[in-house]
Amino acid sequence: MPRSLKKGPFVDDHLIKKVDTQNEAGTKNVIKTWSRRSMIVPAMLGHTIAVHNGKTHIPVFVTESMVGHKLGEFSPTRTFRGHVKDDRKSKRR
């Protein structure tokens, strides 16, 4: 079930403070965060946010089409290594 509209979007306080201070200063440094649950708001447009995926921080450049989505959607946590090749020699026996 989606979040109620009367509550508004959830963004961690520490993250929105970092974005606001960079907007006031006019800088666009990479912001490192572990908050995958935070929603992307219009104030974040043009910023690069490094989102933690459990192992490393993946840089995500925020564009207009990302507004309304969560940061965690853009840093995958699982790596797909491919399916095992069908080995006919071992099956034949």
From Swiss-Prot:
HAMAP family: Ribosomal_uS19 (MF_00531)
Protein name in UniProt: Small ribosomal subunit protein uS19
Family statement: Belongs to the universal ribosomal protein uS19 family.
Gene expressing this chain: rpsS
GO MF annotation, one: structural constituent of ribosome
Organism: Streptomyces coelicolor (strain ATCC BAA-471 / A3(2) / M145)
Assigned keywords, A-Z: Ribonucleoprotein, Ribosomal protein, RNA-binding, rRNA-binding
Alphabetized Pfam families for the sequence: Ribosomal_S19
Stretches of the chain forming a coiled coil according to its record: none
GO cellular component: cytoplasm; small ribosomal subunit
GO annotation, biological process: ribosomal small subunit assembly; translation
InterPro entries documented for this protein: Ribosomal_uS19 (IPR002222), Ribosomal_uS19_bac-type (IPR005732), Ribosomal_uS19_CS (IPR020934), Ribosomal_uS19_SF (IPR023575)
